């Protein structure tokens, strides 16, 4: 029995050990040879990470990270992504390393990456520890607000030698966000209920990116003061909160969202139902803490204030 960084391999299981150990050894040798060109960075949860300069094979552990890497022109360096990394179109052809919350260690190691980028708000701590345990540099980001998304973009640009591209991208995002703020500054803020779960009905509370998007889009989140980030909601409570607008997010892929929207119509005590202000928004635009979130903000602003003079670039 061989104990390798907490992983046990039996001599009786040759196929499993070869499939896992050999790629790990290759990665360790590759990383050892690249150490001379490594630079030390502090990631967003305070960990020290040695990263080759520049990294040439990057594995992304979240759709938001994948979108950021592609936005910085790093498509050739992206060696692997998660299952729901579908944007941009070129990301669909990249090797998959598992789901957002269930990453396959063997698949990541088998891609021989010299950098793995994960997120604290989604990836499991055990996953990061396992990847570290086999010698992989794992840089963790933690964007849960628009300001932190900008910081993430700049950080990823810094560790991948794309600082100029990152700065240009962030400036463009800030310009679009300012345009929205100016356009909506003097408009009345309607009350908004955002539905991001079907069964049970779930919404977004305080401390979430969704809550910030509603506010920046000129609305008031009717659950914005709840201490829970993603609380379950009863229909009675939603009626009591009298939302002027209901926005249904297509969070569960394959759901019959027109039917969900129509299902609200029997609750005509709700102002949003009475005034026929029930809308559907693409979840990918508001769920991923990536540069594309500005598209989600613009779309949400158009929903909440359809008569405004908001201009999209």
Question: Which ranges hold each PLM region?
Answer:
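A short, structured surface patch at a secondary-structure boundary
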Residues: 39, 56-122, 222, 267
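Short helices/loops that flank or line small-molecule/ion binding pockets
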Residues: 105-112, 134, 233-242
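Short helix-initiation/N-cap motifs at beta->coil->alpha
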Residues: 44-46, 97-106, 122, 226-236
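N-terminal secretory signal peptides that target proteins for export/translocation
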Residues: 1-17
């Amino acid at each position: 029995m061989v104990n390798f960084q907490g992983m046990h391999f039996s001599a009786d299981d040759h196929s499993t050990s070869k499939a896992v150990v050999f790629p790990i050894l290759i990665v360790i040798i590759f990383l050892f040879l690249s150490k001379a060109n490594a630079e030390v960075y502090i990631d967003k949860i305070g960990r020290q990470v040695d990263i080759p300069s520049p990294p040439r094979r990057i594995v992304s552990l979240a759709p938001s990270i994948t979108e950021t890497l592609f936005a910085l022109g790093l498509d050739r360096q992206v060696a692997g992504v998660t299952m729901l990394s579908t944007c941009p179109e070129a990301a669909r052809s990249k090797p998959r390393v598992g789901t957002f919350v269930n990453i396959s260690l063997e698949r990541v190691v088998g891609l021989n990456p010299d950098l793995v980028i994960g997120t604290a708000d989604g990836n499991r701590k055990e996953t990061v520890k396992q990847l570290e345990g086999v010698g992989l540099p794992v840089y963790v980001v933690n964007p849960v607000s628009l300001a932190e998304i900008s910081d993430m973009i700049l950080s990823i640009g810094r560790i991948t030698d794309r600082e100029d591209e990152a700065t240009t991208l962030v400036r463009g995002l800030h310009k679009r966000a300012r345009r929205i703020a100016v356009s909506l500054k003097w408009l009345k803020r309607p009350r908004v209920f955002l539905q991001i779960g079907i069964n049970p009905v779930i919404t977004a509370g305080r401390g979430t990116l969704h809550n910030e998007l509603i506010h920046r889009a000129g609305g008031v989140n009717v659950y914005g003061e709840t201490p829970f980030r993603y609380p379950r909601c009863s229909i009675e409570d939603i009626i009591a909160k009298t939302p002027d607008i209901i926005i249904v997010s297509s969070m569960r892929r394959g759901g019959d969202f027109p039917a969900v929207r129509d299902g609200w119509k029997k609750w005509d005590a709700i102002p949003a139902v009475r005034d026929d202000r029930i809308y559907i928004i693409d979840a990918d635009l508001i769920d991923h803490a990536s540069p594309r979130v500005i598209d989600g903000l613009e779309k949400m602003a158009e929903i909440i204030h359809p008569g405004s003079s908001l201009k999209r670039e």
